Every structure is written in structure tokens, then in C-alpha cells.
Design a protein with these regions (language model features):
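Conserved strand-to-helix beginnings and helix N-cap segments that scaffold or border functional pockets
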Residues: 16-20, 64-68, 97, 117
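Hydrophobic/aromatic beta-strand patches that form the interior of the parallel beta-sheet core
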Residues: 6, 34, 53, 102-104
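Catalytic beta-strand/loop module used to bind and position nucleotide/cofactor moieties
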Residues: 66-95, 100-111
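Structured adenosyl-cofactor binding patch, chiefly the S-adenosyl-L-methionine
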Residues: 94-140
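N-terminal beta1-alpha1 ligand-phosphate binding loop
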Residues: 1-24
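Short hydrophobic segments within beta-strands
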Residues: 6-8, 55, 85
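S-adenosyl-L-methionine/SAH cofactor-binding core of RNA-modifying enzymes
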Residues: 28-83
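Short glycine-rich anion-binding loops that position phosphate/pyrophosphate groups of nucleotides
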Residues: 11, 57-60, 88-92
Length: 140
């Protein structure tokens, strides 16, 4: 299962960028990061079995264990790609949200998209660590 982060805006050399790099390097699963301009830009084609997850403040509050279970189920079901979409400052419109398989929220607060990218990278590392029975995640 490819973990594909598609994000609006360039993270560049920043504290958030360093965090993203740190967690992506730790991941044992294949990862791709695609950066798009804040507006426009061509979204990568959706090929084969792909699940679209959009980060959105109206989305599902998903504990780390639930995210791990979802990724594990997709992997076991032969899903080829889990595509995690991070919008620009204004997020996604209703039509874009309707095309998502999952709307995922990191809480009801609004997060800067660069920080949301770092949080997503950490949660993906945590979820894959849970699936590998690695001691990184501590429940409770």
C-alpha cells in the first residue's frame, strides 16, 4: 500500500518540513509526497485501487488505532494507494469533499496546512508502527 501525501503549498526548508522528513524516513511502507501550487496544478491521476482521504476540520475524529486498522484493512484488501489530500488555506469545497472516501480531522481546531502535513506524517508513521507491533505507540 503506497501512502501518498498530496499537499497544496511548498513546505521548503522549515521546522515543519524537517518533521515531515523525519517521519517519512522512518516509514517502512512506500511513501510519495506530491506538492501542488496553492491554486491550480494538476492532481496526480488516480490509478487502480485508490482510497482518497481528505484532511478536513469537518471530518472524522479518528484515533491512531483506528487509522492503523483502516490502513491495515486497505492493505489486506489489495488497495494500491491511500492518497491523503491536504488543501490550501481555504480547504476543500463541497464537490471535492464528496469525492473523498474518508474525511479525516485532527480535531475541531483549524491547523496551518504545513503543520497538518507534519501531523499526518507522524500519524502515518504511528499507524504503520502499530501494524508492525513496534513499541513507538503507547496506548492509554
Amino acid at each position: 500500500l503506497l501512502l501518498h501525501i498530496v499537499a497544496r503549498g511548498r513546505i521548503g526548508r522549515s521546522a515543519e518540513g524537517e518533521l515531515v522528513d523525519r517521519y517519512v524516513k522512518r516509514l517502512s511502507w512506500p511513501v510519495r509526497i506530491t506538492e501542488l501550487p496553492d491554486t491550480g496544478g494538476k492532481l496526480p491521476l488516480v490509478e487502480g485501487q485508490t482510497r482518497i482521504v481528505m484532511l478536513d476540520e469537518r471530518g472524522e475524529l479518528m484515533p491512531s488505532l483506528a487509522l492503523a486498522e483502516r490502513l491495515g484493512r486497505w492493505r489486506d484488501d489489495g488497495v494500491r494507494e491511500a492518497r491523503f489530500m491536504i488543501g490550501a488555506a481555504d480547504g476543500f469545497d463541497a464537490a471535492e469533499r464528496a469525492r473523498a472516501d474518508v474525511l479525516l480531522s485532527f480535531g475541531r481546531a483549524t491547523w496551518p496546512h504545513m503543520l497538518a502535513r507534519a501531523m499526518l506524517a507522524e500519524q502515518l508513521y504511528r499507524a504503520t508502527s502499530i501494524l508492525a507491533n513496534h513499541p513507538y505507540h503507547r496506548e492509554g
